[in-house]
Design a protein with these regions (language model features):
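Beta/alpha (TIM)-barrel catalytic core signal, keyed to glycine-rich beta->alpha loops juxtaposed to Asp/Glu
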Residues: 1-151
Length: 151
């Protein structure tokens, strides 16, 4: 079979599939965004070594990393550490008059071992905002300041 794709969450499963060489592209989700970059440690290097494509699902974490309040998605009493951190990131961006969606997507686009970011748009307005965010230029200083903030 040619052109087989693979999508699964546990990294061990991805790594086993990569070793077989029987797939062309991998779909990771929730593994590379502002909240976590776990795929960069093992999946991206292994896939690059085998010349496999990587699709990065959940770049915006179902909207939590767009600048909308996390509470608009999930009641505060149900928040976990990811929700708390996403809200801190939103506030950090607001304090700097920065568009969080720009930061989120530009961060993901800097990783050249990722070949696609399926965002998902609910309407034309979201599509336009997502396109604009991918075309924004942010300085290295912005990413350095974000990293230094330790969120």
């Amino acid at each position: 079979m040619d052109f087989l794709g693979y999508g699964m969450n546990p990294h061990d499963y991805h790594l086993k599939v990569i070793e077989t060489g029987r797939t062309e592209v991998l779909l990771t989700f929730s593994d590379y965004n502002l909240l976590r970059q776990s795929a960069a440690k093992d999946i991206f290097p292994a896939a690059a070594e085998k010349d496999m494509g990587v699709i990065n699902g959940w770049s915006i974490m179902r909207g939590w990393l767009t600048g909308a309040t996390v509470e608009s998605f999930i009641p505060r009493e149900k928040w976990n550490e990811d929700h708390i951190r996403a809200d801190r990131m939103r506030i950090w961006c607001m304090e700097r008059d920065m568009n969080m969606l720009d930061l989120t997507l530009q961060f993901c686009l800097q990783e050249h071992r990722i070949h696609g970011h399926p965002i998902g748009n609910l309407n034309i307005e979201q599509l336009k905002k997502n396109i604009a965010a991918t075309q924004t230029t942010l300085s290295d200083d912005v990413f350095e300041a974000f990293s230094d903030a330790g969120m």
